[in-house]
Amino acid sequence: AVLPPQAARNPEFYEKQNLPIPTLQVVREEDDGVVISGMKMLATGAVFANEIWIGNVLPLAPDQKKQAITCSIPCNAPGLQLWSRQPMEMNCSSEFDSPLSYRYDESDSMLLCDEVKVPWERVFIHDDALLSRNIYFKTPSHAFGNHQSNVRYWSKMQLLVGLCNKVAGATGADQIPAVRETLGMLSANEAMIAGMVNGQINAFEDWPGNGYVCFNRRMMYAALEWCTQNYSHFIDELRTLCGGGVFQMPANISVMKDAEL
């Protein structure tokens, strides 16, 4: 959980209203640790975890030292609540209708801390607004995280290409030259992100040094930009190929068990 709540990113609003700032921060120090209160988002998979990392990936003002806390806390820490969104699989009645969400889920959680005690041995950064963010960018941390984002996009691109191919095949549209050209374009773009991901690995950097290496950051950020610019276009192509076919489907597969139908 490394982001403050969206509505709490301007502390001046709360100060003018004489209201407590909801962003997670240190409320006091004690001999054996610190006490934190407030909210942080979004801890992906926190409900399945044992420990949660708390930090700051957005820049903090120099006077926001108390919000600069970086630490880890157990998920059963007294005073900690996890506000999780509704799991997707709760609405999946069958594997056929929802093949992905029937098997998997990705549940993000809001962290709400109410006087949570953090021992000093679990505190990594305290009262240093600049270092609180720099630990991600002055080390390979951000490179590993963003490379993983590229790999996720590659997997998603493979899924999209497969879906487009299945949709076109089911409707017979794959025999139309223009549609075949679109499928070829999508396949070529899947190969492109594959090349970008492998390039980051094969053209690795000798950084931070001393025998350690890192993914090629220049190629990594180029891939992130490419993914951002092209994703909506690929989704639009899938929608175009689907056409009105999705409206021909019944509410769920249970109708196939009706003898009269």
Regions from the PLM with identified roles:
Residues 148-206:
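Extended amphipathic alpha-helical segments enriched in small hydrophobics
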Residues 180-184, 214-221:
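Short, charged, amphipathic alpha-helical segments
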Residues 218-261:
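Alpha-helix capping/hinge segments and adjacent helical runs
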Residues 200-210, 248, 252-255:
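Active/binding-pocket-proximal capping segment
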Residues 45, 64, 106, 157-160, ...:
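Active-site-proximal structural scaffolding
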Residues 145, 149-152, 175, 212-215, ...:
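Non-transmembrane, amphipathic alpha-helical segments
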